Amino acid sequence: KTRTKDKYRVVYTDHQRLELEKEFHYSRYITIRRKSELAANLGLTERQVKIWFQNRRAKERKVNKKKQQQQQQQQQQPMPPTQLPLPLDGTPTPSGHPGSLCPTNAGLLGTPSPVPVKEEFLP
């Protein structure tokens, strides 16, 4: 016999979710003893508490994986021109000179064109 007829979705109350989250924050893995205490206090079965913890750990793994992927994508993207470092004295160097930190399109158009610098970086 399959369990599909018996299955139903448990909707937890705000209080139940809060208590389960508090317990999860304390420990990601619940002990047998604490599981039975929590189930009795919240009016849930031990099986429901166990499944909630399994699902919560899966959710945490999913969120952490997504965060890690976002961080990797940010590290792979080049720095925007407005965030390029300036010389130590804080003044922009003229474009086109050797050692200049400001990118230029002088080689393409024939005339130097400095990158705009945010006001907070100007002397």
From Swiss-Prot:
Reported tissue expression: Intestinal epithelium.
GO aspect biological process, one term: pattern specification process
Keywords of the record: Activator, Developmental protein, DNA-binding, Homeobox, Nucleus, Transcription, Transcription regulation
Compartments, record wording: Nucleus
One term of GO molecular function: DNA-binding transcription factor activity
Gene Ontology cellular-component terms listed: nucleus
Region (Interaction with DNA): 8-29
Segments of the chain annotated as binding DNA: 5-64
Biased composition (Basic residues): 57-68
Positions of region (Interaction with 5-mCpG DNA): 47-58
InterPro entries, per database record: Caudal_homeobox, HD, HD_metazoa, Homeobox_CS, Homeodomain-like_sf, HTH_motif
Location of region: Disordered: 57-123
Family per record: Belongs to the Caudal homeobox family.
Protein name, UniProt field: Homeobox protein CDX-1
